Amino acid sequence: ETAKNMTLMLLKLIYNIDLINLFASSNIEKSKLNIKNLSLKNRIGIAGGLDKNAEYFHIFSSLGFGFVEVGTVTLEPQTGNPKPRIFRFTKDKTLVNSLGFNNVGSVQVLNNIKKYKPKFDGVLGISIGKSKNTKTKNAWQDYLHLMDYFYLEADYLAINISSPNTENLRELSSQENLEFLLEKISQKKVQLIDMYKKNTPIFVKLSPDETDENLKNLIEVSEKNSIDGFICCNTTTDHIYPITGGMSGAMLSKKAGDMQKKVAEFKQEKSILIASGGVMNASDVKERLINSADLVQLYTGYIYQGNSLLK
């Protein structure tokens, strides 16, 4: 975690002294895309979790990324789970984390977005989640308050109900809980569209640990409630390491790729599919795009390879 934070601080230093272009990629295919009201310069983005507090998204766009997802953000600041909580398995090009939505809270994140957005050239996604101490039955209130905060500033919102590191969060994926939550979110969005005259797409971030039956039901419930697409997928608790937490990286690649094919099969054609999880190289990106992904996110692959992955 310290290494990750130092790397981000170094990126900021390089940006501040106007040397960021030395590290920017000119190899990412640039084309004007329009997907669900999102105007993108390319299909490659940063996944939620890397820029938790919206302090670096403008720098990632300068490096060549077409979109950046910040967060996950909760209403109030959270310290997250006890440290150490990120473990690197270099031989396997894998991470296991038990972070637990550590972030500075919605007020400060919104301030950061307003501060850095004028320097940002890309699509900004904001991942939102319930607070650790919020009971499942009250989680909808957190998400609606967060929509109030971020709807206007976000190019899209990601509903995180799939992190394994916040207690009871995955309970929101059950059909009954999800139906209730997404009905509330859908109703709120209608109000916000009327208020701001802006249709901000809303995506649901999926867990790779769902059964096929649950996954199909989850997608049906989401589309019934006007969700615009899906992010496939979050970290998995199904791993070989003797550590509690969610695994990402190369060891997730096959599971995430297989799940993406199922999501593509189950979803309606109009629903957007963002591939995330185990994307480690250009071949992985191509494979995800071939298998119906509209956009692709990087996280652990970028942690291990840095900007060389873009080149």
Functional labels for PLM-detected ranges:
Residues 1-33, 97, 102, 106-107:
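An N-cap/entry alpha-helix motif that binds or orients negatively charged groups
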Residues 11-29, 165-177, 215-269:
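Glycine/Thr-rich beta-alpha phosphate-binding loop at enzyme active sites
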Residues 37-46, 120-127, 191-210, 263-275:
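Short beta-strand/loop segments at the ligand-binding rim of alpha/beta enzyme cores
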Residues 46, 68, 109, 126, ...:
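Conserved, mostly hydrophobic/aromatic
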Residues 53-62, 141, 210-224, 265-269, ...:
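Catalytic cores of alpha/beta
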Residues 64-78, 161-163, 229-237, 285-310:
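Glycine-rich phosphate-binding active-site loops on the catalytic face of alpha/beta enzymes
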Residues 71-121:
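A gly/proline- and charged-residue-enriched helix-loop-helix capping module
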Residues 131-143, 171, 177, 203-223:
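Active-site glycine- and acidic-residue-rich loops that bind
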